[in-house]
Regions:
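Short conserved active-site loop signatures built around small residues
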Residues: 1-29, 65
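Glycine-rich, flexible loop/turn motifs
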Residues: 2, 7, 41-42, 51-54, ...
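Short, hydrophobic/aliphatic alpha-helical segments
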Residues: 6-10, 67-72, 196-198
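Conserved PLP-enzyme active-site core in the AAT-like
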Residues: 10-16, 78-207
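Short, mixed-charge, low-aromatic patches
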Residues: 20-28, 43-48, 92-96, 125
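Conserved N-terminal alpha-helix of the aminotransferase class I/II PLP-enzyme fold
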Residues: 33, 38-89, 110-119
Length: 207
């Protein structure tokens, strides 16, 4: 079987023109809802026992191509409305409404502001390690109610490069997931999951 290269995957993965009237470019589906067919098929769709489209808030053919394309590049994907939505969705699910997130102060401004002003409203405490590449400092900052370690592979905007492999080892020693924002590096330069990261987030507008 021929293995497609990165440059081919980034423009072709997840899309079959034959499923879209032979359109060369991915169509933009603007509909909110979809014909469900008969009631039996509708029941299967709403029970998620059959793949298909019901309502665009849940799934949309255009978004599905994006998810499948990123999955081909980086191993898996869920597309959300923004990079900040991806960060929030990930961390709130990991923290389950409480606990602590361990991170670096070297972060994208939107993330840093959210950590300061929004996350405490959800019962989360954010702990900062001044040098995220200091293993002893990271270990010392982990507490019993720490739920995840979050880091940017290359911080925005000051370009601090995180030692993902070491951070993953420390996180896993303590039963924690490592979440990496890989926006600046992109999967072309770095695939954090290959170095031990558990979850990876991106802002598509920046790469």
């Amino acid at each position: 079987e021929t293995k497609l290269g990165f440059d081919t995957l980034k423009v072709r993965a997840g899309y079959n023109p034959g499923d879209h009237n032979q359109a060369v470019s991915v169509p933009i589906y603007q509909t909110a809802s979809y014909e469900l067919g008969d009631t039996e098929r509708a029941k299967r769709l709403f029970a998620f026992s059959e793949l298909g489209f019901v309502y665009s808030r849940m799934a949309n053919p255009t978004v599905t191509v994006l998810e499948q394309r990123v999955a081909a590049l980086d191993g898996g994907a869920v597309a959300l409305g923004s990079g900040m939505a991806a960060v929030t969705y990930t961390l709130l699910n990991l923290a389950e409404g409480g606990g602590r997130i361990l991170t670096s102060p070297q972060l994208y401004g939107g993330t840093f502001d959210s950590f300061k002003k929004i996350y405490p409203n959800f019962g989360l405490t954010i702990d900062y390690v001044p040098d995220i590449n200091d293993p002893d400092a990271v270990r010392a900052a982990i507490r019993p109610d720490t739920r995840a370690v979050y880091v940017e592979s290359i911080s925005n905007p000051n370009n601090v490069v995180a030692d993902i492999e070491t951070l993953a080892g420390i996180a896993h020693e303590n039963g924690l997931p490592l979440v990496v924002d890989n926006t600046l590096a992109t999967p072309y330069l770095l695939k954090p999951i290959q170095y031990g990261a558990d979850l990876v987030v991106y802002s598509a507008t920046k790469n």
